[in-house]
UniProtKB/Swiss-Prot annotation:
SUPFAM superfamilies: ENT-like
UniProt keyword DNA damage present: yes
Phosphothreonine found at: T171
Subunit structure: Homodimer. Interacts with the transactivation domain of BRCA2. Interacts with CBX1 (via chromoshadow domain). Interacts with ZMYND11. Does not interact with CBX3 or CBX5. Component of a nuclear receptor-mediated transcription complex composed of at least ZNF335, CCAR2 and EMSY; the complex stimulates the transcription of nuclear receptor target genes such as SOX9 and HOXA1. Within the complex interacts with CCAR2 and ZNF335.
Pfam family, one: ENT
Glycosites: S192, S200, T235, T465, T470, S521, T1069
Protein name: BRCA2-interacting transcriptional repressor EMSY
Record-level GO BP terms: chromatin organization; DNA repair; regulation of DNA-templated transcription
Function: Regulator which is able to repress transcription, possibly via its interaction with a multiprotein chromatin remodeling complex that modifies the chromatin. Its interaction with BRCA2 suggests that it may play a central role in the DNA repair function of BRCA2. Mediates ligand-dependent transcriptional activation by nuclear hormone receptors.
Region (Interaction with BRCA2): 1-442
């Protein structure tokens, strides 16, 4: 037959492919539809479809999709249903007969291999409108009959049969389709039928809720989702970013926000925050871009899904969400700045919770919260501090704290001044300690304010931009050992918040909060404590506690001495308070590990008084908050702790009891000797005697044995763990005598012996290395200092020995040896790092030196080493007499090196001298940064990087023993003019690193880098000579060392040491957050600890070394100098995140005895302290005590004796100097977990160092 049309068309190959594929798909779809209409799927049909799918190239997924299409096709379903009914009548072949359930097999066949993951409801600009429409439709549909009931007129049979399949289908689809409801059960509250409320409230929350409701499967739709909170949220337009942070009261401290957060669709973001929150004891607060979100955190306790009962809570949890760890939420609690930072850094580990201040700053800006109620837009919020203030009571929070009933939801205030946003919130749930309430003074925008929030276990401080510094005094209710629970009443929580540069909130009672871990030392019952913080812009956390009342139960143990406390008023005028000999200083407990306590005792007030004031024993209790349980299990290495004098023991016992009343209560009360389960190894009360007299008594109480304690539950919340610093500042003689003597006797035969033993500490944990002491070793300025120096040197020697030699095995002096061994066990012995004994001498500087202990381990180390050097002429050979200071500098370097070793993983603790020069530090800081980074990598600390010291120095570190001088040269390069320092540094490049650390953790304060401009800041970090025999190169004549000059920049404090100004002694000890992290690790595995101990020890050492001679005077107070202190922290890089804070706060302000103008430096110091602790979540131990062991793990307490002299800092905050206070730092932080994790790494490093090459300190000692 003729073809009438063309048989070949003008089709390309691609077109043909497409048409063919279409035909295949349509054919397969047609077959499926036909088979579906016939009835249920049978084996024959399956086989047929299997062959057909091969012929037509139909994939399994497409096959299933087609089946699902057919199953959900109501036409086909109706046909199959009708046909199946007729099957029973025998009208069709039996093979197709499937009965009423004609879709069961088809449904099974169409199931997805991988169920769809439920998705969060997307949020768009139209979400609110769409939700409103959807809600209207839902309401309308609710009045209509169920769809299954509408179709069948024959009804019963049809509806019955259809209904099951339909329901089944629906169920399947709902499970496969994203349903937020399941994930966010809490979010949906069937409070009312209408969902409209949320819309009016905070759009974000309501949107999320509504979207969740909309996404719910139809069968669930009858449940109305109503959010009460939306009404609260309405004020907040900024909520756009809102992430709901919900914390249920139950979540309390550790509970993950996550669990809470799942309630909301937004949860995913929140979850991260919740994690952080969980790390923190308190209900996590997410710092939201808007103030409101903070509020929500506080409201978390309500558990109401409304995230922001008080303000729009949604606010910007984004920040938090950005950091899964949600440091933010922690922050909300207490961690606030530091925590937030960490969150951004790493969500997963609480330890990272603490992060460098810089990070926080970076995050804060974005978080700037808007006043809970106001600014729609975050940006506005950022710009408008004031608005936020009004909405949150926080401005007045301080007063509020006492006034507010526990029930008060925490008010959160976020201020953003310099780019740091401070959120203060009060915690409402009882589980959250009342103390969590943090007051930030938003009043001044100029100076940064630290806001401290404490979660149960953690206390966090943030810098608030408020310029004004204020003192807050609160009375703390009498606290019983069970004080911990006091948290319910905000009043009970003692917070002090300082607005100036940094404000610290101290919530001793709250410490006890369940936060689980937090052990807070009890505060003297019935006494009023003044806590002031120096407004250091750069340091996020500093706590200064001054106890007005003479008595503090905790301090009972200390011998009664007259203590002079100086309070620096914002005005810069100083008030001196004398406390009766019996009086004890208040104990400050920081729930957050980051916080550092600075207890300053006026050194210069009177020479006569000084000696007594000099000693500030410190006890730190670390607890891990992240875990509900207290991680602080002491290894119980029985340790020299027993040796501690009775007084010390009493103190410890009291402290422990108080602390124990908190979660840790269980064992804490035991005696110190027992190693308080509290695991605060405090170097027992007499950490160091700074008495001028060359009093032998070493404040070192190595009670720290408990330090060794393992923290079983490290993982969760190293960071969260609160740190309590217990500082006992009492007359040097008594305190030194009781505790120190016991320890001394045990620990040191002679300073020298200690030095010898130092070499023992081959193992230096990187983390310990991370703690640079460099800064601390400021030259003692005045000749007067010599006598002090002597006393100190002995103490230092002890400390150094403890600290320096992690390996303790070699320590010559038996007692020391035991200590060292203990340390080895605890791994922290060295780190315990003695509290810096105060360098009592004439100038208040001595007290500052105590601060050395300050977290900035560098400083601590440096000071320590300096002390060693200063120790006395006693320190033999290595000593160098510093003409300016009149101190002998000796191998103080050793300790420094140890610190360095920790840091660098080289055994260069000795180098602790951290090139005193701030400039050097700063300059090197960048270089150091790299080094630190490497270190950090080891330590897993992110903060260090900035600090990396110059590599040159680092290289020298390795070469250290071989070429001390070259190192010095490097230092010189850095800008250090002083060779002597350089030599020390040179001896231990790591030391240099420490210095840089001293400079600051860059992260914490960007300004650190500024600091570098300062050329001559040296801390002469001479490691104590004894310790440093090797570094003996320590060499720098004290005279060479320049007086530290502290320049306090908003972010950084620069410390320059110049010999001339005796009064200024600044301990620049950046908190050694890194070290702390490691320490916790050490704590975790006591045995394992030996290596770990090295790290902890180093930290401790750095703490010890941190002391700065009182004589040293700061010439300039430059914010940039602060960086120095910060650097120290970075040096500690091991616990990098934490370190930042420490560093920032670290820099002790040098105060000039003579000039109030010195105020600036002290401020810096304080800041550093504050920053250090919270950031690190590190534990601060008393340097003295556990220097070697107890402190080991989180050591890094900064105890600073701040001269009574008013120190006018930029922030002009009040500094309270508490000569004889016990500060107990309990660190229950995730840090410990970190430490555990890092411990292994660090241990490896340490062991490598130990095994492979003796640390410079060791070598030095051996040489000696």
């Amino acid at each position: 037959m003729p073809v009438v049309w063309p048989t070949l068309l003008d089709l390309s190959r691609d077109e043909c492919k497409r048409i063919l594929r279409k035909l295949e798909l349509e054919a397969y779809a047609g077959v499926i539809s036909a088979l579906r209409a016939q009835g249920d799927l049978t084996k024959e049909k399956k086989d047929l479809l299997g062959e057909l799918s091969k012929v037509l190239s139909i994939s399994t997924e497409r096959h299933r999709a087609e089946v699902r299409r057919a199953v959900n096709d109501e036409r086909l379903t109706t046909i199959a249903h009708k046909m199946n009914l007729s099957l029973y009548l025998g009208e069709r072949p039996s093979y197709s007969m499937s009965g009423p359930n004609s879709s069961s097999e088809w449904s099974i066949e169409g199931r997805r291999l991988v169920p769809l993951m439920p998705r969060l409801v997307p949020q768009t600009a139209f979400t609110v409108t769409a939700n409103a429409v959807a809600n209207a439709a839902v309401q309308h549909n609710a009045s209509l009959p169920v769809p299954a009931e509408t179709a069948s007129k024959d009804g019963v049979s049809c509806s019955d049969e259809d209904e099951k399949p339909r329901k089944r289908r629906r169920t399947n689809s709902s499970s496969s389709s994203p349903v937020v409801l399941k994930e966010v059960p809490k979010a949906v509250v069937p409070v009312s039928k209408t969902i409209t409320v949320p819309v009016s409230g905070s759009p974000k929350m309501s949107n999320i809720m509504q979207s969740i409701a909309n996404s719910l499967p139809p069968h669930m739709s009858p449940v109305k989702i109503t959010f009460t909170k939306p009404s609260t949220q309405t004020t907040n337009t900024t909520t756009q970013k809102v992430i709901i942070v919900t914390t249920s009261p139950s979540s309390t401290f550790v509970p993950n926000i996550l669990s809470k957060s799942h309630n909301y669709a937004a949860v995913t973001k929140l979850v991260p925050t919740s994690v952080i929150a969980s790390t923190t004891q308190k209900p996590p607060v997410v710092i939201t871009a808007s103030q409101a979100s903070l509020v929500t955190s506080s409201s978390n306790g309500n558990s109401s899904s409304t995230s922001s009962p008080i303000s729009s809570t949604v606010a910007v949890t984004t920040v938090v969400s950005s950091t899964p760890s949600v440091v933010m939420s922690t922050v909300a609690q207490g961690v606030s700045t530091s925590a937030i930072k960490v969150a951004s850094t790493r969500l997963p580990s609480p330890k990272s919770l603490v992060s460098g201040p810089t990070q926080i700053l970076a995050q804060f800006p974005k978080q700037h919260q808007q006043s809970p109620k106001q600014q729609l837009q975050q940006v506005q919020q950022q710009t408008q501090q004031p608005v936020a203030q009004p909405s949150s009571v926080s401005q007045q929070q301080q007063p509020q704290q006492s006034a507010l009933p526990p029930g008060i939801k925490p008010t959160i205030q976020i201020k953003q001044e310099s780019g740091v946003k401070i959120i203060t919130q009060q915690v409402q749930p009882s589980k959250i300690l009342p103390k969590p309430v943090t007051a930030t003074l938003p009043t001044s925008s100029n100076s940064p304010i630290m806001v401290v929030s404490s979660n149960g276990a953690i206390m966090t401080t943030k810098l608030v931009t408020t310029p004004t510094g204020t003192q807050a005094t609160y009375t703390r209710p009498t606290v019983s050992p069970s004080l911990g629970r006091v948290a319910t009443t905000p009043g009970a929580a003692t917070y002090v918040k300082t607005t100036s540069g940094s404000i610290i909130t101290v919530v001793p009672k709250s410490l006890a909060t369940l936060g689980g871990k937090i052990i807070s030392s009890n505060i003297v019952s019935g006494t009023t404590t003044k806590i002031t913080t120096i407004p250091m812009t750069s340091k996020p956390n500093v706590i200064v506690v001054q106890k007005t009342t003479g008595k503090g139960t905790t301090i009972q143990g200390l011998p009664g001495k007259n203590v002079v406390t100086t309070l620096l008023n914002a005005g810069g005028e100083k008030t001196l308070q004398t406390v009766p000999a019996g009086a004890k200083p208040a104990i400050i407990t920081a729930t957050r590990p980051i916080t550092k306590m600075i207890v300053t005792q006026p050194k210069g007030i009177g020479s006569a008084v000084q000696p007594a004031a000099k000693i500030i024993p410190t006890k730190i209790v670390y607890g891990q908050q992240g875990k509900t349980q207290v991680l602080i299990k002491p290894k119980p290495v029985t340790f020299q702790a027993t040796v501690v004098s009775e007084q010390t023991r009493q103190l410890v016992t009291e402290t422990l009891q108080q602390a124990s009343r908190v979660a840790d209560a269980s064992n804490s009360s035991a005696q110190e000797g027992k190693e308080e389960p509290q695991g605060y190894t405090d170097s027992s009360s007499s950490s160091t005697e700074s008495s001028q007299s060359s009093q032998d008594s070493q404040p070192v109480v190595h009670v720290i044995a408990s330090r060794r304690q393992d923290w079983s539950e490290h993982e969760i919340a190293m960071e969260t763990s609160p740190t309590i610093i217990y500082q006992d500042v009492s007359s040097e003689s008594q305190s030194a005598t009781s505790t120190i003597k016991a320890l001394l006797e045990l620990q040191q035969t002679t300073v020298k012996e200690k030095l010898e033993s130092k070499p023992r500490q081959p193992t230096i944990d990187l983390s310990q290395m991370a703690v640079p002491i460099q800064m601390t070793q400021e030259k003692r300025h005045s000749p007067e200092s010599p006598s002090i120096a002597v006393v100190e040197s002995e103490l230092v020697a002890e400390y150094i020995t403890t600290v320096s030699h992690r390996s303790q095995p070699q320590q010559p002096s038996q007692p020391q040896r035991t200590l060292l061994q203990h340390v080895a066990q605890s791994q922290t012995a060295t780190q315990t790092s003695v509290v810096v004994k105060s360098i009592p001498a004439s100038s208040p500087g001595a007290i500052t030196h105590i601060m050395q202990q300050a977290l900035s381990s560098h400083t601590a180390f440096t000071k320590h080493s300096e002390e060693l050097g200063t120790e006395e002429g006693e320190v033999e050979e290595m000593d160098t007499l510093d003409p300016q200071t009149g101190l002998f500098y000796r191998s103080a370097l050793t300790q420094s090196q140890s610190t360095k070793q920790q840091k660098l993983s080289q055994p260069q603790l000795e180098q602790t001298q951290l090139q005193v020069k701030t400039l050097q530090c700063f300059q090197t800081k960048q270089k150091q940064t790299i080094h630190l980074q490497a270190d950090q990598l080891q330590h897993k600390l992110t903060q260090m990087p900035q600090l990396s010291i110059r590599h040159q120095k680092l290289n020298p570190l390795q070469q250290e023993q071989a070429q001390p001088k070259p190192d010095a040269q490097h230092t010189q390069h850095t800008v250090v003019a002083k060779d002597r320092q350089l030599p020390t540094l040179m001896a231990q490049p790591p030391q240099t690193v420490v210095q840089v650390l001293a400079v600051k953790t860059t992260q914490q304060l960007p300004k650190l880098q500024q600091a570098p401009n300062q050329p001559k800041i040296y801390v002469q970090p001479q490691t104590p000579q004894s310790q440093m025999a090797l570094p003996s190169s320590e060499k720098q004549p004290a005279s060479q060392v320049e007086q530290p000059i502290i320049t306090q920049g908003s972010s950084v404090t620069k410390i320059t040491f110049e010999g001339r100004q005796p009064p200024t002694v600044t301990k620049i000890t950046g908190g050694s957050s890194v070290p702390k992290l490691t320490s916790p690790v050490t704590s975790i595995s006591p045995i394992q600890a030996s290596e770990k101990t090295a790290v902890s020890d180093i930290l401790q050492m750095s703490l010890m070394e941190a002391q700065i001679d009182t004589n040293v005077e700061h010439m300039v107070v430059d914010p940039p100098k602060k960086a120095l202190a910060t650097n120290v922290l970075t040096g500690e890089a091991g616990a990098l995140p934490s370190t930042h804070v420490v560093v920032a706060g670290m820099t002790k302000c040098r105060e000039s005895c003579s000039s109030p103008s010195a105020v600036g430096p002290p401020l810096t110091t304080r800041k550093i302290e504050a920053a250090g602790v919270p950031t690190t979540g590190q534990f601060m131990r008393i340097q003295n005590v556990g220097q070697k062991k107890a402190e080991e793990s989180p050591t890094e307490i900064i105890i600073q004796a701040i001269p009574q002299y008013a120190i006018p800092c930029h922030s002009s905050s009040n500094v309270v100097v508490e000569p004889s206070g016990l500060l107990e730092l309990n660190n229950f932080t995730s840090q410990q977990l970190d430490d555990d994790e890092t411990a292994m790494e660090q241990d490896i490093d340490s062991s490598t160092e130990d095994g492979t090459e003796p640390s410079p300190s060791q070598s030095a000692v051996e040489r000696s």
